[in-house]
Amino acid sequence: MLSRLFRMHGLFVASHPWEVIVGTVTLTICMMSMNMFTGNNKICGWNYECPKFEEDVLSSDIIILTITRCIAILYIYFQFQNLRQLGSKYILGIAGLFTIFSSFVFSTVVIHFLDKELTGLNEALPFFLLLIDLSRASALAKFALSSNSQDEVRENIARGMAILGPTFTLDALVECLVIGVGTMSGVRQLEIMCCFGCMSVLANYFVFMTFFPACVSLVLELSRESREGRPIWQLSHFARVLEEEENKPNPVTQRVKMIMSLGLVLVHAHSRWIADPSPQNSTTEHSKVSLGLDEDVSKRIEPSVSLWQFYLSKMISMDIEQVVTLSLAFLLAVKYIFFEQAETESTLSLKNPITSPVATPKKAPDNCCRREPVLSRRNEKLSSVEEEPGVNQDRKVEVIKPLVAETESTSRATFVLGASGGCSPVALGTQEPEIELPSEPRPNEECLQILESAEKGAKFLSDAEIIQLVNAKHIPAYKLETLMETHERGVSIRRQLLSTKLPEPSSLQYLPYRDYNYSLVMGACCENVIGYMPIPVGVAGPLCLDGKEYQVPMATTEGCLVASTNRGCRAIGLGGGASSRVLADGMTRGPVVRLPRACDSAEVKAWLETPEGFAVIKDAFDSTSRFARLQKLHVTMAGRNLYIRFQSKTGDAMGMNMISKGTEKALVKLQEFFPEMQILAVSGNYCTDKKPAAVNWIEGRGKTVVCEAVIPARVVREVLKTTTEAMIDVNINKNLVGSAMAGSIGGYNAHAANIVTAIYIACGQDAAQNVGSSNCITLMEASGPTNEDLYISCTMPSIEIGTVGGGTNLLPQQACLQMLGVQGACKDNPGENARQLARIVCGTVMAGELSLMAALAAGHLVRSHMVHNRSKINLQDLQGTCTKKAA
């Protein structure tokens, strides 16, 4: 019950920070103002001459008071030093704010209690400093700092208040009751000290429950990075703060405190109200005497200076003990501000992500792909640990394990590259007897009879006879693979047919075609096949993304691309890894329909935007697939033409065929309600597929992903060979201003298309979809305590990708998907593999952006390409087509 009340209080305070702060400050000022204007107007030394009471002030009292003040200052210093070890400037700032305002409230209470007399404040302040506790304030701040959004900040503050509020309330009550016992001692100095202590506890409690949570919420809201949607205050080592704070205090301790509180309440009640209080046990008897305001012995005088000058002169005049205290405070402040920073940085460097392990999440691994801890297998070595000596080799990193392809023809994933001639590898199994074929082609009629014979077939015909039948139009050229006994022979015959029609008959000599599993190509990937194009496949990595390491395959012929991306992956890994989120998932198809009049189109548009109309279309759409689920419709008009953009989840498939089938069924259903509607095309370019389009940039298409990382200044200098300031400057003027000057749509990046296309080719994606999938905005800014670290993020709103269907059925492409642990469909959570692949693409793009921008900032781009991207073969020794014809 109490936790619920404190949670509601925390949520209210965090949701209305301005109101709470203004109200708290106003209340505090009102307390001071009412005291100043309505209190006692007799002030000793200013308008009244008060008698000097002869009191023996022992030097030991002065020494004890001075030591107390110094201990209080040292106590506050060590508390702030411990907070600095957390590495968060927000923790320090918020704790400092808490201390300052708490002291202000406490001072106001003391002034009010002492009736405008400020001399007691010097004695009271050490007790306030000794009783202030920043641990709970910093704990509540950690709750807020572990949030990902402003809404989560409010929720976490409420949750923290629910956990910390009851404990803090009970502790404050016990402290007041324990310290309050001293006010009944009869010793005047002890009574005053205990009274100050109680006021200090109450002031801290008041600020913690009102001003502090509101201030935390407001500070984090004002410092939020609104453009990225991610707060810049969030720190990685606060990720588990909620788990730590969930451990509530020991119930036994809480019960003991409650019993103690009840006992102390009885003691206070008996001493103050039941028993006869003796005159010497009452501080009120001494109040006027202590303040020197006795009516009988005081005499009125004319003030010589104004009231504020009088108070200022009293504050400025210092004794030797005050000089010692202020000197200690000044020296500690100088040490903390100027000398402590280097020591803290060197201490934190031992915990720096450069040498610290990548955090392994406690979440149970999914069944979508097989994962194994590296250290679980004794004979297995982690290559990334061997390559990077700076990384702790005892760490336990979750690495994606490649899956073994579940197919009988796994051995055919590797194939021989080279000329088409020569002997093929020895076939497995028993060899069939050789068939003797005539040297000269037989007549077409006889060849047709053999081809159509169930006993013989195409294997009893020579290649020349097959070519003869093709030229005579008896066999369509596109059916060669299906009519021949093997697909490979059909490809070989097509190559022979094509060679005679080419300017250079030997053009296909270096285009390989043997030892490839064409059964996966036919009817799925390509028609009129004449071979396959071997493209070099490199690997970049390890890419540390979301606590896992990935070796990313990239198929490219551009020199430096893989090496550059690999350098970016290394920088990200040394910085502690990258984080990513999938913001949206939905493939689109935008058909165009026409109605007789524009008003009719407007009527259809209005009907589609009603809940009833959408429900009818959704039922028809969802009935076409067990994965396709219509999410929303985006409808627009151009005259009497109506463009309807269907958006749907498609599981692990990229989903163009799936959503096209659902769109077609939905349009047929729509025609039942509007018979005059004419379907012009199932794709009206409002999707938009494989074309630059602002609708994809704004609304998203496929997977919308954001990825971010923080690169320490040391890594920027040593790995990227540049500075944070230079990279930010180039990013603003190249990726943002330059792209805007060019009128770019989604091209606010350096070379996202390079990485996207290389991964797409390697992983069997539709390479043409790099047009929309490469939409990316790269942002960089300074971060860290000294603003020397580099914060980089890449936001890609339209990654069109899948792990089933199309080119992902080919064995080499499946091998690359297996490298990433995302091959095939995810059985437990449909669509998870495709979303994970989209995250990997975005993370790799960010690595490529990081490296290229560093090269541009350092001026290394041209030099590296001159070394690594230029062929060293003497091209004059190779005869080109144009050279030969000219000769």
Swiss-Prot record:
Record comment: activity regulation: Regulated by a negative feedback mechanism through sterols and non-sterol metabolites derived from mevalonate. Phosphorylation at Ser-871 down-regulates the catalytic activity.
UniProt-listed CDD domains: HMG-CoA_reductase_classI
GO terms for MF: hydroxymethylglutaryl-CoA reductase (NADPH) activity; NADP binding
InterPro entries: HMG_CoA_Rdtase (IPR002202), HMG_CoA_Rdtase_cat_sf (IPR023074), HMG_CoA_Rdtase_CS (IPR023076), HMG_CoA_Rdtase_eu_arc (IPR004554), HMG_CoA_Rdtase_metazoan (IPR004816), HMG_CoA_Rdtase_N (IPR023282), HMG_CoA_Rdtase_NAD(P)-bd_sf (IPR009023), HMG_CoA_Rdtase_sub-bd_dom_sf (IPR009029)
Record EC number: 1.1.1.34
Impact noted for substituting H487Q: No loss of activity
Keyword terms, alphabetized: Cholesterol biosynthesis, Cholesterol metabolism, Endoplasmic reticulum, Glycoprotein, Isopeptide bond, Lipid biosynthesis, Lipid metabolism, Membrane, NADP, Oxidoreductase, Peroxisome, Phosphoprotein, Steroid biosynthesis, Steroid metabolism, Sterol biosynthesis, Sterol metabolism, Transmembrane, Transmembrane helix, Ubl conjugation
Active site: E558, K690, D766, H865
Recorded consequence of changing H860Q: No loss of activity
GO CC terms, sorted: endoplasmic reticulum; endoplasmic reticulum membrane; peroxisomal membrane
Residue list for modification Phosphoserine: S871
Catalysis performed (reactions): (R)-mevalonate + 2 NADP(+) + CoA = (3S)-3-hydroxy-3-methylglutaryl-CoA + 2 NADPH + 2 H(+)
SUPFAM superfamilies per record: Multidrug efflux transporter AcrB transmembrane domain, NAD-binding domain of HMG-CoA reductase, Substrate-binding domain of HMG-CoA reductase
Keyword DNA-binding carried by entry: no
Glycosylated residue positions: N281
Localization annotation: Endoplasmic reticulum membrane; Peroxisome membrane
Protein name, UniProt field: 3-hydroxy-3-methylglutaryl-coenzyme A reductase
Organism for this UniProt entry: Mesocricetus auratus
